[in-house]
């Protein structure tokens, strides 16, 4: 069994090019740190959602460290990191607008 995470990121003032670029960098970093798949979903004018899949709980837990580091960047983002559960696979029902990896 793996872990799927879904993480909302609200950017005060809207999704600027800088905010989207930072989100891309975070997604690529997640992939480097063990995520098997990472998707970025636009939700409204000021919110992005990461949908990420991990092979095990230990690799998923490292996500929090990566996200906290990203929050110290120049672009202010409010992260909701409290989601994650063991699953056998994704349900495929998300409206995925942009596949990053």
Where are these regions (language model features)?
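Active-site-flanking beta-strand signature of metal-NTP-handling nucleotidyl enzymes
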Residues: 2-10
């Amino acid at each position: 069994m793996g872990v799927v995470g879904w993480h909302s990121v609200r950017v005060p003032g809207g999704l600027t090019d800088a905010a989207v670029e930072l989100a891309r960098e975070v997604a690529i970093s997640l992939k480097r740190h063990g995520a098997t798949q990472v998707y970025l979903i636009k939700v409204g004018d000021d919110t992005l959602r990461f949908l990420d899949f991990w092979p095990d709980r230990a690799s998923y837990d490292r996500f929090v460290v990566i996200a906290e580091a990203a929050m110290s960047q120049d672009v202010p983002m409010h992260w909701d990191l409290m989601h994650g559960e063991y699953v056998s696979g994704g349900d495929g029902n998300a409206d995925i607008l942009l596949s990053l990896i």
